[in-house]
C-alpha cells in the first residue's frame, strides 16, 4: 500500500450537515475499499484562485491516506460524478 494526499473542494452552498455527510461518505468509500485514513484536515472556506462554475469560494478538505489503487480509483470515480465536489486531486507521496 502506498501513501496518498487527497485534496477536494466542496461547493460553498452545501449546508453544514450535508457537508459532514459528504465528508463521511467519501471517507467511507476509502475505508470500505481497504484504505487507512492517517490524517484529515479541514481548511475551511477559502477563496478560489479562479472561478469554478461561477463560484469564488469553496470548502477545502485534505486527507492523508495509506491505500491501494482500487480505493483511490473508486474515490476518483465518485468525486467526478458528485456535483457538490468542485475539484479534487490525488497526489502519490514519495517513499523515503
Swiss-Prot record:
Q: Which UniProt keywords apply?
A: Ribonucleoprotein, Ribosomal protein, RNA-binding, rRNA-binding
A Gene Ontology molecular-function term? structural constituent of ribosome
Keyword RNA-binding appears in the UniProt entry: yes
InterPro entries to which the protein is assigned, alphabetical: Ribosomal_bS6 (IPR000529), Ribosomal_bS6_CS (IPR020815), Ribosomal_bS6_sf (IPR035980), Ribosomal_S6_plastid/chlpt (IPR020814), Transl_elong_EF1B/ribsomal_bS6 (IPR014717)
Q: Highest taxon of the source?
A: Bacteria
One GO term (biological process)? translation
Cellular component terms (Gene Ontology): cytoplasm; ribonucleoprotein complex; ribosome
| Role noted for this protein | Binds together with bS18 to 16S ribosomal RNA.
The entry's family comment says: Belongs to the bacterial ribosomal protein bS6 family.
Please state what the protein is called.
Answer: Small ribosomal subunit protein bS6
